[in-house]
Curated annotation (Swiss-Prot):
Its EC number is 2.3.1.286. PANTHER family: NAD-DEPENDENT PROTEIN DEACYLASE SIRTUIN-5, MITOCHONDRIAL-RELATED, NAD-DEPENDENT PROTEIN DEACYLASE SIRTUIN-6. The active site is at H134. NAD(+) binds at residues 52-71, 114-117, 209-211, 235-237, 253. Belongs to the sirtuin family. Class IV subfamily. NAD-dependent protein deacetylase. Has deacetylase activity towards H3K9Ac. May have a function in the safeguard against genome instability and DNA damage to ensure plant cell growth. Involved in responses to ethylene leading to the transcriptional repression of some ethylene-responsive genes via the regulation of histone acetylation H3K9Ac. The gene is SRT1. Residues 453-465 have a biased composition (Basic residues). Its cofactor is Zn(2+). This is NAD-dependent protein deacetylase SRT1. It comes from Arabidopsis thaliana (Mouse-ear cress). Keywords: Ethylene signaling pathway, Metal-binding, NAD, Nucleus, Transferase, Zinc. Coiled coil: none annotated. Binds 1 zinc ion per subunit.
Length: 473
């Protein structure tokens, strides 16, 4: 979870048991338990997964209660751990992406998360199949109409407070609120109700990376027992619910999940991170009618005053036959102003330099400049989802990132301006689930942004498809 989130929480003395010892099952026992879990998943008709901070530690996000957890170090009077990358650039783990594949295959029916890192949504779990019990650090919601807004920056507040932005739904415009709970905040019905419903219906609840200490969330998995459901707990520490579980696995979550996917002959899909930004060109005619005064702004799609955390700087240049001064925009807001002859047309070139945490250094773009922008407001119809899917496929095929595409064009009459929204691939991760069970802590898998493996056996594909069809039946 976020260090910023922990610092924003109200102070309480009792945060539960911390500094908990970690246990590792012997390799042969671990393998047996992995195979047992795979069989339970294969037989399951309604699988629910319940996740905690332990599934995100491999993403560079510290947990709370482990030997080096945030609250453990706080209680010991030690410095807090430093995140290995900016919170907003954290990428889904192998476990996150394996859950996506299980959901796509129709095996996983619902995910319940205690985390506020938003990685389940970013990985591709559908919102309607996800309960974020404690909120999402990157989500704002409208208390009036219920609209949700997933941001590419961390929302400033926690505790369901008003933020600085308003709902963009027509005829609404209410002030938005953050979604992250403070200690005394009750679990929202929108999140807890479907979580309870699916736990009661589940024949298998798989708990991943959670110490199962925070109430009332920790009691949700137990609701499957009345209907004959089973519980499996995968965690390095012992939990208060271990005695209720059918299987308890002490091992690295990524390692266990990788082994399960291998046993099921299922591939863990790559993760492609796509970020959006807009280039806005605003024009006005000079008083003597001879020149065009224009302003160029590179802005967030979440609002002109919102930060662009994934962009470090922008280099702007012009066609070779024009002597306009180039510019380097290295402070937000990214803004430049120029004056040109009224009838001139030329190309503007952009080199977008990305911030730390992105897998690509920069992207090159160009935008034609014409002195006349239509006075009629309109939005060009572009199949956004088709563009995004094409970018994902290209990134995986080319084993690289930096691909870009236009997902929206719109013209506004007052002030006269044209906005072009770009989608660009800023990160790529591929996951290889090959295991080595010589020792519990040794998992031979690669997490990379510059390469991917598309190889998959025909036998594996047939088994995976058969498993999905059997589950849906």
């Amino acid at each position: 979870m976020s260090l910023g989130y922990a610092e924003k929480l109200s102070f309480i003395e009792d945060v539960g048991q911390v500094g908990m010892a970690e246990f590792f099952d012997p390799s042969h026992l671990l393998q047996c338990k992995i195979e047992e879990l795979a069989k339970l998943i294969q037989k399951s008709k309604h699988l629910v997964v319940f996740t905690g901070a332990g599934i995100s530690t491999s993403c560079g996000i510290p947990d709370f209660r482990g030997p080096k957890g945030i609250w453990t170090l706080q209680r010991e009077g030690k410095d807090l751990p430093k995140a290995s990358l900016p919170f907003h650039r954290a990428m889904p783990s192998m476990t996150h992406m394996a859950l996506v594949e299980l959901e796509r295959a129709g095996i996983l029916k619902f995910v319940i998360s205690q985390n506020v890192d938003g990685l389940h949504l970013r990985s591709g779990i559908p919102r309607e199949k996800l309960s974020e019990l404690h909120g999402d650090s990157f989500m704002e919601m409208c208390p009036s109409c219920g609209a949700e807004y997933l941001r590419d920056f961390e929302v400033e507040t926690i505790g369901l407070k008003e933020t600085s932005r308003k709902c963009s739904v027509e005829k609404c415009g209410a002030k938005l609120k953050d979604t992250v709970l403070d200690w005394e905040d009750a679990l929202p019905p929108k999140e807890i109700d479907p979580a309870e419903k699916h736990c009661k219906k589940a024949d298998l609840v798989l708990c991943l990376g959670t110490s199962l200490q925070i109430t009332p969330a920790c009691n949700l998995p137990l609701k499957c027992l009345k209907g004959g459901g089973k519980i499996v707990i995968v965690n390095l520490q012992k939990t208060p619910k271990d005695k209720k579980a059918n299987v308890v696995i002490h091992g690295l979550v990524d390692k266990v999940v990788a082994g399960v996917m291998e046993s099921l002959n299922m591939k863990i899909p790559p993760y492609v991170r796509i970020d959006l930004f807009q280039i806005i060109l605003t024009q006005s005619i000079s008083g003597d009618q001879r020149f065009i005064n224009w302003t160029l702004r590179v802005a967030s799609v979440h609002g002109l005053t919102s930060q662009l955390p994934f962009i470090k700087s922008i280099e702007v240049s012009f066609s070779d036959n024009h002597n306009y001064k180039d510019a380097v925009l290295d402070k937000q807001p990214f803004l430049m102003k120029r004056r040109t002859a009224r009838n001139e047309t030329f190309d503007i070139f952009f080199k977008v330099n990305y911030s730390d945490g992105c897998d690509c250094v920069s992207t090159q773009l160009s935008l034609p400049f014409e002195f006349k922008i239509s006075t009629e407001e309109h939005v060009e119809i572009i199949d956004k989802e088709a563009v995004l899917q094409s970018l994902r496929e290209k990134a995986v095929e080319e084993s690289s990132c930096g691909q870009s595409g236009v997902v929206e064009r719109r013209v506004v009459s007052e002030p006269r301006s044209e906005a072009v929204v770009y989608a660009t691939v800023t990160s790529l991760r591929t996951y290889h689930s090959q295991q080595s069970l010589l020792a519990n802590g040794d998992l031979k898998w690669k997490l990379e942004g510059s390469g991917t493996s598309r190889k998959r056996s025909r036998t594996g594909k047939r088994k995976s498809k058969a498993l999905a069809e059997e589950t849906k039946a």
